[in-house]
Amino acid sequence: MSFTDFQTYIHALESAGELHRTDVEIDPNLELTEVSIRALREGKPALLVERPKGSQYPLVINHFSSSYRTELAFGRHPDDIGHELIHFLERAMPPTLQFLLNNKPTIKRFLNARPKTVSTGISQQIVESPNLDALPIQFCWPLDGGRFITYGQIFTYDPRDGKRNIGTYRMHVFDKETTGMHWQIQKGGGFHYFQAQKLGQDFELAVALGTSPALTFATIAALPEGIDEAMFAGFLQNKRVEFLKGKSISLSVPANAEFILEGVVPATERRMEGPFGDHFGHYSAASEFPVFHLKAITHRKHPIYPAIVVGKPPMEDKFLGDATQQMLAPLAKLIHKEITDLWAYYEAGFHNLLVVAIEQRYQKEAMKAALGLMGTDQLSLTKCIVTVSSGVNVRDFDAVLKEIRENYDPHYDFVMIPKVPLDTLDFTSYKMNLGSKMIIDATKKPQRRSSDEQGNNDLRQRDTGDLRSFLRGIDRRITDINIIDNALLLVKIDAPIQYYTSSPEIISALKPNAGKEILKKLLQLPELSHLTLIAIVSEDVDIHNQENYIWGVFTRFDCERDVLFSEQKLIGISPVYNGVMGIDATWKPGYQEPLTMPESIIKKVDEKWGKIWKK
């Protein structure tokens, strides 16, 4: 079944037993976040809150927070969509009559990719003056800078040629008529705004709240720059996306949204935006961003406000991100024929860890592919790429560690790239939008024996308790360890966590932190020389839970500052690494605080929990 508007999908969820309605009042100020997180952890259905505190409009949350719900949204598994796309495109050049006859359903989908202009639509059934206070906008985390619209789909048009872009960006509500516009680097809307600034023009745009599932997924998909997300949505839902002229702006807006916010972003105005509890599991710091001025709100009759909460994984964005990469990952083969699969780990916030399977046809082709991906659209924001041989399950972190253990030699297979663009949300380099990246090539090399063949498996036979006692004798700050497949030693330490050091100058003047001190000791121990990786983490990371330790390691280090080897030197201007690779993934002075919910809010939700889910 195709869904061309939001409420049709919501009703389908309810019919399938995947949505629960509650008339219990829930406060969008913090309470909704706790309810959303707890419901996801307990496997509850999506929740339609009929009486959000302070608003007449109902809201829905967790409507994509399971694999079943994403399949329901498209009528099939996202993997199947990706396979259909790549199968069609690989055989379409040159097209033959037999090809066209055999692929009529897919051709119809491509014809339906063309957006359509209509004269009326449900999104303009009601026209109102600007008043964001009427909407049940969330205050997600206790240290957030204010209320944030979290599911806004921003429709922008290039002022030079009119090409459309749709992206999902958070919007910090300053008052009833203005918000921040959090355009991170490498985002299409930000590129359009850049062109408007060059022309000295104020920049009109529209924000849709609550669209069809296909348009929602297309909006967050990492499509190549210049590809219209509305066309991809039309392909996904097999029906053309409809647009109509805005009421207060000259642009086209979606015809079938729950709400449309119309307005303008001045070319030169900036305002402090944030902090905001983001999907890396920490607060992103306040910084200056453009300002959106609301001119009009239109909506359908009896609209439902869409809400989402992001934070420490797993959250609802796990299912959104996984579904979009399942659909789009096969397309990487069109550009890089050597790539057979790739997977970005939601546990690491997606951009911090990408694993790529390579069919290597010549030496170092895997490294070539990794460097190419680091220069490709939104994949250019990836911090760590691990390459493995074709056939390895890139979605299985244990399988990836096995390949690293057997095939990775840092002398030949490690590349660190300093001083390059980095995800805006990454705080580990202390410089917004700048940092470092690294590549680990763990593909099989026919000319080398694997570490297992060389007999480097001593630690498999060693009792973890004995090793823990031995390492605590080296440094009493070590509280726990976990050895994973003889490849990765996770070490938890008890050391003070300092947040919000005031300036980079103070940070650089501080002595090395405990994590780096302990890491240097461990890297020199002969007893650990057969390991491949050592990672030091802080007390808040559960090193026996894979989801948690992937998050705790990959969101908390800068490659240039925090990666060490047991042997490293310069030969000419070339860095040479050997031995065990160490990562200091502890919290460091200047890092932002991790996301936690106050006990008072947890207790409030405890009191309501049974009533919320009462049938």
Describe the residue ranges of each PLM region.
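Extended, highly charged
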Residues: 1-276, 281-615
